[in-house]
Amino acid sequence: MVAKILDGKQIAKDYRQGLQDQVEALKEKGFTPKLSVILVGNDGASQSYVRSKKKAAEKIGMISEIVHLEETATEEEVLNELNRLNNDDSVSGILVQVPLPKQVSEQKILEAINPEKDVDGFHPINIGKLYIDEQTFVPCTPLGIMEILKHADIDLEAKNAVVIGRSHIVGQPVSKLLLQKNASVTILHSRSKDMASYLKDADVIVSAVGKPSLVTKDVVKEGAVIIDVGNTPDENGKLKGDVDYDAVKEIAGAITPVPGGVGPLTITMVLNNTLLAEKMRRGIDS
């Protein structure tokens, strides 16, 4: 068996076309979604990622801006900028690029974002809504993972799903989304014992820990669906996933590549949530 390759680039392209159509429809009603991104410092990877978000937003007809603060910016300065965006009626969604410099509390900043503009879905109110099944902003990578599974017609009902990693960004929220689809979910982490026994029984594996080749062919059940969120650069700068891709694709039923799998959907879901934010504040049904 050779796995079906779940091409995130193509899935994202198709999804963004649908978003673009919705943006155009909103514009006809006099509303244009706007994404504001706060970037603190000069980290190269963060700058590149922020530019990608801005470009993607503008490509589908949104307005986007980067609010760039110096590496030495104080927590108060970041909060002041954030409050300005919170109170700016032209801004639909706000995103704060992390990591932040050590003098700025990431948690304090994320909690200061207006929950109705929190397109990353990291505000405690939005996290809480997710866990009681209320409409909210879902973190973008988990939302992208679910779109990949949906696009590939993966039936999750009563399936055994194993999530490796328990972060608030990916592991925990994607576990909740899988539960909503009636999968039986197991979360593995650094303290888990005998991980192989869980993986061998998994119909779906989502790995999001940043450990290259953690998931090997010998622990994957034939026909399993593999979602690889890992993106660790090797010594040559090439991105490596958590999964031994070349070996595992020979036995899996479907698999995401790295790069080109989950990554494109993460940015796409930032756009999705920005559109949702604009619709919600204008009282327009999604």
From Swiss-Prot:
Family to which this protein belongs: Belongs to the tetrahydrofolate dehydrogenase/cyclohydrolase family.
EC number, UniProt record: 1.5.1.5, 3.5.4.9
Q: In which pathway does it act?
A: One-carbon metabolism; tetrahydrofolate interconversion
Q: How does it assemble?
A: Homodimer.
Q: What is this protein called?
A: Bifunctional protein FolD
What domain of life is recorded for the organism?
Answer: Bacteria
Which reaction is the catalytic activity of this chain?
Answer: (6R)-5,10-methylene-5,6,7,8-tetrahydrofolate + NADP(+) = (6R)-5,10-methenyltetrahydrofolate + NADPH; (6R)-5,10-methenyltetrahydrofolate + H2O = (6R)-10-formyltetrahydrofolate + H(+)
User: Which processes are annotated in GO (biological process)?
Assistant: L-histidine biosynthetic process; methionine biosynthetic process; purine nucleotide biosynthetic process; tetrahydrofolate interconversion
Entry binding sites for NADP(+):
G165, R166, S167, S190
Tell me which GO cellular component terms the UniProt record holds. Answer: cytosol
Tell me, in a sentence or two, what this protein's role is.
Catalyzes the oxidation of 5,10-methylenetetrahydrofolate to 5,10-methenyltetrahydrofolate and then the hydrolysis of 5,10-methenyltetrahydrofolate to 10-formyltetrahydrofolate.
Organism of origin is Staphylococcus aureus (strain JH9)
Q: Which PANTHER family match?
A: C-1-TETRAHYDROFOLATE SYNTHASE, CYTOPLASMIC, C-1-TETRAHYDROFOLATE SYNTHASE, CYTOPLASMIC-RELATED
Coiled-coil ranges (or none): none
Record gene name: folD
GO MF term (any one)? methenyltetrahydrofolate cyclohydrolase activity
User: Source organism lineage?
Assistant: Bacteria, Bacillati, Bacillota, Bacilli, Bacillales
Q: Which UniProt keywords apply?
A: Amino-acid biosynthesis, Histidine biosynthesis, Hydrolase, Methionine biosynthesis, Multifunctional enzyme, NADP, One-carbon metabolism, Oxidoreductase, Purine biosynthesis
